[in-house]
Swiss-Prot record:
F-type ATPases have 2 components, F(1) - the catalytic core - and F(0) - the membrane proton channel. F(1) has five subunits: alpha(3), beta(3), gamma(1), delta(1), epsilon(1). F(0) has three main subunits: a(1), b(2) and c(10-14). The alpha and beta chains form an alternating ring which encloses part of the gamma chain. F(1) is attached to F(0) by a central stalk formed by the gamma and epsilon chains, while a peripheral stalk is formed by the delta and b chains. This is ATP synthase subunit delta. SUPFAM superfamilies: N-terminal domain of the delta subunit of the F1F0-ATP synthase. It is found in: Cell membrane. It is a peripheral membrane protein. It comes from Priestia megaterium (strain ATCC 12872 / QMB1551) (Bacillus megaterium). Belongs to the ATPase delta chain family. It comes from the Bacteria. Gene3D superfamilies: N-terminal domain of the delta subunit of the F1F0-ATP synthase. The gene is atpH. Keywords: ATP synthesis, Cell membrane, CF(1), Hydrogen ion transport, Ion transport, Membrane, Transport. Its main location: membrane.
Length: 181
């Protein structure tokens, strides 16, 4: 089975458990911590995947690194470790976040703009586009891209809304070339 499929299964199991316990947000916060720990300390992944380090020692590292987290999250990380699937932890957290956002009516969106967006601009974009994708709100991350010249490009899931000047110029350019032939 592919890693993304396995990550989805683990995320779904965690999400169902969190739903039963009414701990969706708390679980997401704790999984975010796990993801951040692995992102900030890539050496941890190296240690946990090293073939010469015993599984008992690896479990000890995990227990120490995540001692402050709930037993459920600790157990999940240990389970991934025991089943040699620790590499999917980031994908699992991403899948859990997606499931939690679906329940809340939230979607992640990436907005590309020439300059950083203000909080008001992000809020306005969220209000304008959330209903177009059937959501209540959008979690917006902003990436500055000077090549756009002006305007914005918005990515929500696999949908792209391109209102950039560079895109409009490209469309005009293609139109002129088509009429030339």
């Amino acid at each position: 089975m592919s890693q993304p499929a396995v990550a989805k299964r683990y995320a779904l199991a965690l999400f169902q458990l969190a739903t039963e316990k009414q701990m969706i947000d708390e679980m997401q916060d704790q999984l975010q911590i796990v993801e951040e720990v692995f992102a900030k300390t890539p050496e941890l992944m190296d240690v946990l995947t090293h073939p010469k380090i015993t599984i008992e020692r690896k479990k000890q590292f995990v227990s120490e690194a995540f001692a402050e987290l709930s037993p459920t999250v600790q157990h999940t990380v240990l389970l991934l470790l025991e089943r040699h699937r620790i590499q999917i932890v980031s994908e699992m957290v991403k899948e859990y976040r997606f499931l939690a956002n679906e329940v809340r009516g939230v979607a992640d969106a990436t907005v590309y703009s020439v300059k950083p967006l203000s909080a008001d601009e992000k809020r306005a974009i969220s209000q304008s586009f959330a209903s177009k994708v059937g959501k209540h709100t959008l979690n917006i991350s902003n990436i500055v891209d000077k090549s756009l010249i002006g305007g914005v490009k918005l990515r929500i899931g696999n949908r792209i809304y391109d209102g950039s000047i560079s895109s409009k110029l490209e469309t005009i350019h293609r139109g002129l070339l088509a009429h030339r032939s």
